[in-house]
A protein has these predicted regions:
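Substrate-binding surface in catalytic domains of secreted glycosidases
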Residues: 152-165, 173, 216-254, 279-282
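Short, functionally important secondary-structure microenvironments
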Residues: 205
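Active-site glycine- and acidic-residue-rich loops that bind
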Residues: 195-201, 241
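Non-catalytic accessory regions flanking glycosidase/transglycosidase catalytic cores in CAZymes
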Residues: 24-145, 151-196, 208-213, 252-264, ...
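Active-site clefts of carbohydrate-active enzymes
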Residues: 228-229, 251-289
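Bacterial N-terminal signal peptides that target proteins for export
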Residues: 2-13
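N-terminal signal peptide c-region/cleavage motif recognized by signal peptidases
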Residues: 19-22
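Short, solvent-exposed segments of well-ordered alpha helices
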Residues: 82, 231-234, 284-287, 291, ...
């Protein structure tokens, strides 16, 4: 009887041990070398910038992410303030401070559309003057974005006259005025505030009436308000996949875009962050917000978006890579990792659903970004046929809290990816 009881007791223990071994099995990587997607530089390192940002005080950190595009003046500031010649002076200085390569970051400039008060400089001739002012500073503007979040003019700003049709008329008028100054100018819009039903309706009606003249269709992504669970917040990154697909289809449909369906207009996300509530640090200046931002950026690049600008570069409430005091946030570390995702994207998958994976080939080097979304470490087999692992760095919430450098990982057949971490692995083609 005693032996029988011992055997019965041993079976659950043995099962637990076997389950533990199975759960601890390293994830394996599968790289598809037959498909390649060019990764636009103006997605990987794009940011919203405003003249209120003390760039000079944090230039070392901000240069470390190698900005590739700046959207100016960034957010609601463009709705509430005139765009004057004086605005372009600090912009030019900070553009020079943030230049890390042979060329400065590309520039997107928002024109003023919403008036809000008598005397506001939001007429077509004011947009033309802004173009002349930019030329006077020898600034090369890649895109003029006409206004900012016009879907909210009637909702948050109390002016019901701002329909999509009125915005389209304004877009045409400002565009025509700027083209007289700069015949090669390109134009972006409508920069709707989100992808809820109201904003999507606004964007769709804009496309129907202005699809023939918009050169970059833009919208903003803010899927949460910072109050969801961490798991729900991270999973909201799926909106990127959904929205890129549906807006590409919208533009290419003759029914939805009767005036411009043959143009294959590029896509742009000119503001994005996990939460839209600047006064609430949760899911903006924490690790979850950083992991979401990195994943959203990588997905935008891989899925064919041409321009993206994270909100924001610096010191905008809880938004920004560093705060007003110059203290780094997790998003700084995330974009330091992302800057290396250059060249051609290669599909990379694993058998661990907790891992987000991306790969980019540039010459003989393959860069892999691996995000562990789980709250515990997950093992990863580093083997990739035809490649040799030559380097690895990661960061966690603790890394940021202690303001440490990235954690250098030992090179081995298996790596433990820390909980809620973003790891960069570098391989060399054999």
């Amino acid at each position: 009887v005693t032996l029988h009881l011992l055997r019965r007791a041993a079976w659950p223990l043995l099962g637990t041990c076997l389950f533990g071994l199975a759960a601890a099995a390293p994830a394996t990587l599968t790289l598809d070398t037959t498909r390649a997607t060019p990764l636009p530089p103006t997605v990987i390192g794009g940011f919203n910038y405003g003249n209120w940002m003390p760039v000079v005080e944090a230039q070392k950190d901000l240069r470390s992410v190698a900005p590739t595009l700046l959207r100016f003046p960034g957010g609601n500031v463009g709705d509430e303030n005139d765009l004057t010649a004086a605005n372009f002076v600090p912009l030019k200085s900070n553009l020079e401070l943030l230049t890390t390569g042979p060329k400065p970051p590309a520039l997107m400039v928002q024109t003023r559309v919403f008036g809000g008060k008598p005397g506001a400089k939001n007429a077509p001739e004011d947009a033309a003057q802004a173009a002349r002012d930019a030329q006077a500073q020898q600034l090369q503007v890649a895109y003029w974005e006409i206004g900012n979040e016009p879907d909210l003019y009637s909702v948050n700003r109390g002016d019901a006259s701002w329909t999509p049709e009125r915005y389209c008329d304004t877009f045409r008028a400002q565009r025509q005025a700027i083209l007289k100054v700069d015949p090669g100018a390109k134009f972006a819009g409508p920069a709707v505030s989100n992808t809820g039903d109201g904003a999507v309706n606004f964007l769709s009606r804009f496309v129907k009436n202005c699809g023939d003249i918009v050169d970059l269709l833009t919208w903003h992504e803010y899927p949460t308000d910072g109050t969801r669970s961490d798991a729900e917040a991270l999973s909201s990154v799926s909106v990127i996949d959904r929205d890129v697909k549906r807006f590409r289809a919208l533009l290419d449909s003759q029914e939805s875009n009767p005036l411009g369906y043959t143009r294959h207009t590029p896509l742009g996300v000119t503001e994005y962050s996990l939460s839209y509530v600047s006064a609430r640090p949760r899911h903006l200046s924490d690790q979850v917000g950083a992991l979401w931002a990195a994943e959203a950026t990588a997905r935008l690049a891989e899925q064919g978006v041409s321009v993206a600008a994270y909100f924001a570069l610096q010191a905008t409430g809880a938004h920004g890579l560093v705060d007003l005091a110059g203290i780094p946030r997790p998003t700084l570390y995330a974009f330091q990792q992302l800057r290396h995702l250059t060249g051609e994207g290669r599909p990379l998958t694993s058998d661990d659903p907790a891992l987000w994976l991306h790969a980019a080939q540039e010459g003989a080097l393959l860069t892999v970004l691996a995000t562990n979304t789980a709250t515990e470490a997950h093992p990863l087999s580093t083997a990739l046929p035809g490649y040799q692992l030559i380097g690895g760095k990661t960061f966690t919430e603790k890394t940021v809290e202690e303001e440490d450098d990235m954690v250098r990982l030992p090179l081995g057949a298996t790596l433990d990816l820390p909980a809620r971490s973003l790891t960069r692995l570098v391989y060399k083609r054999q």
